Design a protein with these regions (language model features):
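Short amphipathic alpha-helix adjacent to the substrate-entry channel of hydrolases
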Residues: 80-100
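Short beta-strand element of the alpha/beta-hydrolase
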Residues: 63-73
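Active-site nucleophile elbow and catalytic-triad environment of alpha/beta-hydrolase enzymes
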Residues: 166-167, 203-217, 222-223
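Serine-hydrolase catalytic-loop signature spanning alpha/beta hydrolases and amidase-signature enzymes
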Residues: 73-76, 80, 99, 125
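N-terminal cap/lid segment of alpha/beta-hydrolase-fold proteins
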Residues: 26-61
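C-terminal catalytic histidine-bearing segment of alpha/beta-hydrolase fold enzymes
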Residues: 54, 228, 238-290
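Short beta-strand/loop motif that positions the catalytic acidic residue
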Residues: 227-229, 233
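Primarily recognizes the serine-hydrolase "nucleophile elbow" in alpha/beta-hydrolase
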Residues: 121-194, 209
Length: 290
């Protein structure tokens, strides 16, 4: 499918009545590059269901790519591709970055450890098939917000060289990225694991929490990591990003923490969204452009 991403934004704005989206300002002043969209690429299956991602490749693609974690409360919903272009990806596409929107098995059926395993498999698949996807496996970034930010940090900080001896070619492939951006991420699941009506994905065995808590994975070989958090976030306290930043700094990792004054969870104010989006795009452009 080929479409002009400005048109996608206009359709979204009309449908939702959102003319002041921060990304819309970027589109209005940007080029009219075409985007090739390949939806529903299958990277695995579980319980008879396909695990998929969508590929958004701009006409000015240079090989760098960003995996977007489609996750809120560790629920991964399908969204029309043209909406994603307008809502989240315009600035990245304008910079020549290919974007891959990765979905995982969702709560309440699947819990956080399973969601993390899904997106890790997606990363391995993407690296294994990087040539046919038209991207450079050594110039991959990952980003997301909230639960998606948590998963992004796990992929970035919990990298591995693959499961040696596995019969699965995908599992034998390394899971590594070159840059991370996380908006308002929970970083220590040990404190919040257990039965939860609002977040059923957290209802899993307590002893597994440490293995999916990014705060425990900071190490000197971690990729450049940008954290963005609002100081008025009432859902995921800003301390999450602060302690994560301190841990990364302590290991000598290139990292930055942006605190948005008055920013809430989700950056609902257009100015907050614009600041976060601009910082995210600049971070990936700096670290993924050859």
């Amino acid at each position: 499918v080929k479409m002009t991403w400005i048109l996608g934004f206009l359709l979204l704005s009309i449908a939702l009545g959102l003319p002041d989206l921060a990304i819309g300002q970027q589109i209005a002043s940007g080029s009219e590059a075409d985007v090739d969209v390949t939806p529903d690429v299958v990277y695995g299956r579980k319980d008879g269901m396909a695990l998929t991602f969508d590929v958004f490749r701009p006409s000015n693609a240079h090989g760098g790519a960003v995996l977007y974690m489609v996750s809120g409360g560790w629920v991964s919903r399908w969204t029309p591709p043209e909406w994603l272009i307008a809502w989240s990806f315009g600035g990245l596409l304008e910079k020549g970055l290919t974007v891959l929107a990765v979905r995982h098995g969702s709560a309440p059926r699947y819990k956080v450890p399973e969601a993390e395993a899904d997106v890790r498999r997606a990363l391995r698949y993407i690296r294994l098939h990087s040539e046919e996807l038209g991207i450079d496996e050594d110039r991959l970034g990952v980003f997301g917000g909230s639960a998606g930010g948590h998963l992004s940090l796990m992929l970035g900080l919990g990298s591995d060289d693959g499961v040696m001896g596995s019969n699965d070619e995908i599992l034998r492939t390394a899971a590594r990225v070159a840059a991370v951006v996380a908006y308002y991420p929970p970083v220590d699941l040990r404190a919040i694991v257990g039965p939860s009506e609002r977040f059923p994905a957290l209802d899993f065995a307590e002893e597994k929490a440490a293995s999916i808590s990014p705060i425990l994975f900071a190490s000197p070989d971690d990729p450049p990591t940008l954290l963005i958090h609002g100081d008025a976030d009432m859902l995921v306290n800003m301390e999450n990003s602060k302690v994560m930043f301190e841990a990364l700094q302590g290991e000598g990792v290139e990292s930055e923490l942006i605190i948005i004054p008055g920013g809430d969870h989700g950056f609902r104010l257009p100015a907050d969204r614009e600041r976060a989006q601009q910082a995210m795009v600049e971070w990936f452009d700096r670290h993924l452009r050859r």
